[in-house]
Amino acid sequence: MTGMVGTILRRKAEQNMTDVTIRNVTKRYGALTVIPQLSFRIEDGEFVVLVGPSGCGKSTLLRMLAGLEEISGGDLLMGADVINDRPAKERDMAIVFQNYALYPHMTVAENMGFALKLRKRPRAEIDERVDKAAAILGLGKLLDRYPRALSGGQRQRVAMGRAIVRDPQVFLFDEPLSNLDAKLRVQMRAEIKALHQRLKITTVYVTHDQIEAMTMADKIVVMNEGRVEQMGTPLELYDRPANIFVAGFIGSPSMNFLPATVAATNGPLLKTPEGVALPIDGGPTLTGRSEVTYGIRPEHLQLGETGIPAEVVVVEPTGSETQLYVTVGGREVVAVLRDRVDVRPGEKIWLTPRKGCAHLFDPNTGARIAG
């Protein structure tokens, strides 16, 4: 193994494990508490994505990790070391921002090597590390250009190259793809994931885009109002969301939710308030419950001859699939069908949930019951 990738991996092998622990971390602005006692751990080499709606505290947490925001309580640890009071420049972390944060009067090479220049590293070392990072990111022919002559994707690669050149223990990404168009976002998220697979550096990535989270992460932390709703692998969150918030946030289009009453017959029977029967299977334990929230993902609904009666409102064909917006008992439901279908607004259809794919939640707490 040669080049900068080999150098970074050898350095990691010589160091202690770079896990990151957030332990009872609190953030207050005056009397306002925006993060109340947050705790979780990021293992060495993991790619962890913090995801959630605007204002949930994910960027604030990232800035506290970077040393750009003070914490109000609790501890931040790298390995066994508490870094609460360690200045940002001494935390051995490199951050990539949404707006690239490139110096317009510096060339690509000068931008990438600037942190090493501030550390008064030898010119030969700076040039070598810049050249190796440029080779990893395909920037070799752009080193003499200025940021104004670069595309958005090229600028983001330069920002990533600047982080790589620093050879940090932890990478931090703060919504780095938000300014890019849809096609370039897809390309860049694949490049960032491939980069992590090569360098194996502990990475914390912030986004509001759950598609980015699902496609890039080893683990996802879903945040809401400064709290962790659930942490797990992408498929764990998709298959077994801990509550209605996670179920509705992970997946696109969002999971459908219908209120239901429980009637005990030979087995549990669910009906909407309008009397529409909702199929369930697997015999979930609903003893003592009179009401639940029924959840089913759009991609787990199929056209059938029986099932849930619905009326078509809007048909959206995309070529590879068809999205149907329908009403069930007066409530909007979305179905994503892989097959091309000939249905029209106003038409009555039946939707059949795929077996084993229904989710049940407590309507009062939002917590998962079964399914």
Swiss-Prot record:
CDD domains: ABC_MalK_N. It comes from the Bacteria. Residues 20-250 form the ABC transporter domain. InterPro entries: AAA+_ATPase, ABC_transporter-like_ATP-bd, ABC_transporter-like_CS, ABC_transpr_MalK-like, ABC_transpr_MalK/UgpC-like, Mo/tungstate-bd_C_term_dom, NA-bd_OB-fold, OB_MalK-like. Its main location: membrane. SUPFAM superfamilies: MOP-like, P-loop containing nucleoside triphosphate hydrolases. One of its GO terms (molecular function) is ATP binding. It is a peripheral membrane protein. GO terms for biological process: carbohydrate transport. ATP binds at residues 52-59. Keywords: ATP-binding, Cell inner membrane, Cell membrane, Membrane, Nucleotide-binding, Plasmid, Transport. SMART domains: AAA. Pfam families: ABC_tran, OB_MalK, TOBE. It is found in: Cell inner membrane. GO terms for cellular component: ATP-binding cassette (ABC) transporter complex, substrate-binding subunit-containing. NCBIfam families: PRK11650.1. Probably part of a binding-protein-dependent transport system y4oPQRS. This system probably transports a sugar-like molecule. Probably responsible for energy coupling to the transport system. Belongs to the ABC transporter superfamily. PANTHER family: BLL2173 PROTEIN (PTHR43875:SF10), MALTODEXTRIN IMPORT ATP-BINDING PROTEIN MSMX (PTHR43875). This is Uncharacterized ABC transporter ATP-binding protein y4oS. It comes from Sinorhizobium fredii (strain NBRC 101917 / NGR234).
